[in-house]
């Protein structure tokens, strides 16, 4: 299977990690919750963890690749004050200013 479409997700935060099993059918996410999040990967999408904080979703169908990437991102969307969470690689997060004293 040749992959035409790619979607890179970046995990930002101390202790936040991603990994896959040997077949690449399950994505494990450690996002600061008390439990590990397991996501079943759809058969038409392949998922690779290039680094513990970089996820690559590939596939032939653009809609399915971006749909799975959106599901992964919805597990921990970027925070507006510190920017921690899961974001697309080329996404720009506009941070809010904190309280002024």
From Swiss-Prot:
It comes from Marchantia polymorpha (Common liverwort). The keyword Methyltransferase does not apply. Belongs to the universal ribosomal protein uL6 family. The gene is RPL6. One of its GO terms (molecular function) is rRNA binding. GO terms for cellular component: mitochondrion; ribonucleoprotein complex; ribosome. InterPro entries: Ribosomal_uL6-like, Ribosomal_uL6-like_a/b-dom_sf, Ribosomal_uL6_a/b-dom, Ribosomal_uL6_bac-type, Ribosomal_uL6_CS. The lineage of its organism: Eukaryota, Viridiplantae, Streptophyta, Embryophyta, Marchantiophyta. Keywords: Mitochondrion, Ribonucleoprotein, Ribosomal protein. It comes from the Eukaryota. This is Large ribosomal subunit protein uL6m. The keyword Mitochondrion applies. Gene3D superfamilies: Ribosomal protein L6, alpha-beta domain. PANTHER family: 60S/50S RIBOSOMAL PROTEIN L6/L9, RIBOSOMAL PROTEIN L6-RELATED. Signal peptide: none annotated. One of its GO terms (biological process) is translation. It is found in: Mitochondrion.
């Amino acid at each position: 299977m040749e992959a035409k479409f790619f979607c890179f997700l970046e995990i930002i935060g101390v202790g936040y990690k991603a990994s896959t099993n040997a077949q690449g059918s399950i994505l494990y996410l450690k996002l600061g919750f008390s439990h590990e999040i397991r996501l079943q990967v759809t058969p038409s999408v392949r998922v690779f963890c290039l680094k513990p904080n970089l996820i690559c979703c590939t596939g032939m169908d653009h809609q399915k690749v971006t749909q799975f990437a959106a599901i992964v991102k919805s597990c921990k969307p970027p925070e507006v004050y510190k920017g921690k969470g899961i974001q697309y690689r080329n996404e720009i997060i506009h941070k809010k200013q904190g309280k002024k004293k």
